[in-house]
Swiss-Prot record:
Protein family: Belongs to the carbohydrate kinase PfkB family.
Annotated tissue distribution: Expressed in roots, endosperms and leaves.
Pfam families: PfkB (PF00294)
Highest taxon, organism lineage: Eukaryota
Any one Gene Ontology BP term: starch biosynthetic process
Enzyme class, UniProt record, top EC level: transferase
Known role: May play an important role in maintaining the flux of carbon towards starch formation. May also be involved in a sugar-sensing pathway.
Keyword Kinase: yes
Organism (species): Oryza sativa subsp. indica
Protein name in UniProt: Fructokinase-1
Gene: FRK1
A GO molecular-function annotation: ATP binding
């Protein structure tokens, strides 16, 4: 990757989250909702840009008020939106999200089909994708055609151009026809990624085993990988590289809303990796990068909403120094 740019290109969905004005209620009980920009790949792109890195987003939005608003949010946050296209015949996706009293998030999606699902491979900004040092994606874009084929083609283009491929499945069971199809399609591209990040919930979903022990995690390891990460919420993160493995504790903060914390973690880690790709082979450097990512995720959880909560590098370093 010597001589390549430090650009992180995110591929996938960007949508509007509608979040209740009060916490701890079901969607049916919510008295009112506020709108917030969302979508994990877009959050990652903005996280990278907020930290001073080069970031771009590739995806499709509805040619509507919400779609134009989301594209403007990307630009306002320093993300290159040259990979964004608009669909005049489909709406921007909506999601109603609530944090129930038991702490679990509840989702209800409006996508039948939404614009993000209708991206075709002919609409890909190939030149932008070829400039990526890291090409990052989730699994929601694998659910339906034509977006699935566009996703697979974009991965090929990025890989052929020398990019690292980064995969965060970002499981949303409610969007898949069945658990079986979700598992099969999420794993269908597993072998292509250089960097994979899963949560402990996703680890259990993909392995069928409720454990974060090394032997369980290693069921998801592939010889083609450079780094496999399991995030454990406020317990930090476990990491597995080709020649070493370990765990990095998180930072203790007062959590308000964990939405976007995982995306902040991914964005921060990718930012550090493109700054110094040798950290994938150097345990000390990698642990420093993960500490930085943990701090970024922790700060994001202290405020409401994903994008407004994403920190700057100064804020992250301040937390790391005070810990």
């Amino acid at each position: 990757m010597a001589g390549r740019s430090e650009l992180v290109v995110s591929f996938g969905e960007m949508l509007i989250d509608f979040v209740p004005t009060v916490a701890g209620v079901s969607l049916a009980e919510a008295p009112a909702f506020v709108k917030a920009p969302g979508g994990a790949p877009a959050n990652v792109a903005i996280a990278v840009a907020r930290l001073g890195g080069g970031a771009a987003f590739v995806g499709k939005l509805g040619d509507d008020e919400f779609g134009r608003m989301l594209a403007a949010i990307l630009r306002d946050n320093g993300v290159d939106d040259g990979g964004v296209v608009f669909d005049a015949g489909a709406r921007t996706a909506l999601a109603f999200v609530t944090l129930r009293a038991d702490g679990e998030r509840e989702f209800m999606f409006y996508r039948n089909p939404s614009a993000d699902m209708l991206l075709t491979h002919a609409e890909l900004n190939v030149e932008l994708i070829k400039r990526a040092a890291v090409f990052h994606y989730g699994s929601i874009s694998l659910i339906a055609e034509p977006c699935r084929s566009a996703h697979l083609r974009a991965m090929e283009i990025a890989k052929e151009a020398g990019a690292l491929l980064s995969y965060d499945p970002n499981l949303r069971e409610a969007l898949w026809p069945s658990r079986e199809e979700a598992r099969t399609k999420i794993l269908s591209i597993w072998d292509h990624a250089d960097i994979v990040k899963v949560s402990e919930v996703e680890l259990e979903f993909l392995t069928g085993i409720d454990s974060v022990e090394d032997d369980v995690v290693m069921k998801l390891w592939r010889p083609t990988m450079k780094l496999l990460l399991v995030t454990l919420g406020d317990q930090g993160c476990k990491y597995y590289a080709r020649d070493f493995r370990g765990a990095v504790p998180s930072y203790k903060v007062q959590q308000v809303d964990t939405t976007g914390a995982g995306d902040a973690f991914v964005g921060a880690l990718l930012r550090r990796i493109v700054q110094d790709p040798s950290s994938l082979q150097d345990q000390k450097k990698l642990e420093e990068a993960i500490k930085f990512a943990n701090a970024c995720g922790a700060i994001t959880a202290t405020k409401k909403g994903a994008i407004p909560s994403l920190p700057t590098e100064v804020e992250v370093l301040k937390l790391m120094e005070s810990a």
